[in-house]
Amino acid sequence: MLTKLKLSLRNINFNLYLALLLLGFVPTIYNTLRVFLLGQLPGEWSFSIAGQLSWVNLLYEIINEAIILPLFYFLGQTKSDRAILSNRIHTGFLATFGIYVVLTTMVIVFAEPMLACMATDPSIIPASASYIRIESVANLFAILTQFVLVALVTVGKIKYLYVFTGARLMLYLVADTYLVSTLPFSANLGVNGIGYSNILVNALLLAAAATLLAKEGIHIFARGAFSFGWMREFAKIGSISGLESLVRNVAYTMMISRMVNIVNEQGTYWVANNFIWGWLLLPVLQLGELIKQEVSSNRQNIRRNSLGYFAITTMIAVLWLVSIPGWKPFMVHVLGFDEVEKLFSLVLLLMGFYIFFAFQNVFDATFYGLGKTNYMLFESVITNSLYYGAAFCLYKAGIWIPTLTGIALLFGLGNVFDSIVSFAAYAFLLKKQNINILNPQPGEIENSPAP
């Protein structure tokens, strides 16, 4: 088995993994800086106001996963025909713009009712509404920038992805310093400054990306006769991914985000999520991106590399355990969070459940790499209807009373339940495709297309 494991690890593209880690580390840096800056602001509600954006972003995530995830495939299909590619980029950009304008308008108009529905503390609803309205505009620029970057990668300009990632970091550092910080020369815009910073940075990056794309002969703002016919097939594929995200995020919004608001712990939960998703899960999520790339390029990589994927995941989990003594100093001196004991206990509790998530990440990334989004939809329907459906009934019956620890346990056990369902789907897929991940033989290097 050890020989097979070494063989599997040698097959993995660690250079690409390192590049993905560096790309993922950039948003971790500026998000951590933002947590620190919020901790320096006067008043006790800064984290809670910023935390309201977490459930708003879930609305955008649903559309994002329905559009961006299938986009690489549909643009990649036509990269050899510049005329068809240009049409798809132009029409796709217009459709994305239209969808996000509608969503952004809805958030702006219904901000207060949505906050009330989410059981937000009435005293912070006006400030929270102002903030999420600003962020909704920023999200519009962000998704359009992401769309154009996908187009640039499709035409072979992947180097721009690295350039824009570095530029994004520098722009955020400068913008946040001048708009959010408490330094003497800062505009001192508080939490809203983060939203304005996002608008400024993403608008600049969108303009730059569109200019570079125009130099490649593709003008997203050009006038002319364009065909939207290809989007019928795009909608079929995107709807499955979007439906899976809808089921998953609606359950999370109502059973986790709303419950956290009910117990007035949105700030603590938001900072905990930033720490977990920004630092602990960074290598896990980027491993998932690597798996998607390797599996989509050659389905035989499931058999050849999966042992290595699980070994890397195990090493990441061990590193989490080793790093625990450094968490409190980091939370005090870097995050600047006052209630460190509460934050530390919450992260420590959630970490055990996220180990299950880390291994599930291998299963789910394999599904995405093969284009089997129907497996993801199956997971979401089973987990969110059975597990969270039962939890909701217990809550309405007054049997389960939400507390911060209780909500964390609810979410964590949901992760375990979802991981079990995902593993069952993964085992079914391997059996159906006749793939034995315990036998990464070196002799079979053929390029076999994904089913």
Short names for language-model regions:
Residues 48-101, 105, 145-154, 269-323, ...:
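Small-residue-rich hydrophobic transmembrane alpha-helices
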Residues 169-206, 325, 385-423, 432-434:
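Membrane-interface helix-loop junctions in multi-pass transport and translocation proteins
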Residues 38-61, 123-129, 191-192, 233-238, ...:
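Interfacial/gating helices of multi-pass transporter permease domains
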Residues 109, 122-148, 276-279, 338-363, ...:
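Alpha-helical transmembrane segments of multi-pass membrane proteins
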Residues 83, 151-178, 192-195, 199, ...:
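Alpha-helical transmembrane segments of multi-pass membrane transporters/permeases
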Residues 1-17, 127, 187-198, 207-249, ...:
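Interhelical loop/hinge segments that connect adjacent transmembrane helices in multipass membrane
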Residues 28-48, 115-122, 178-189, 246-282, ...:
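Helix-terminus/linker motif at the lipid-water interface of multi-pass membrane proteins
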Residues 102-129, 318-344:
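Short membrane-interface helical motifs at transmembrane helix boundaries
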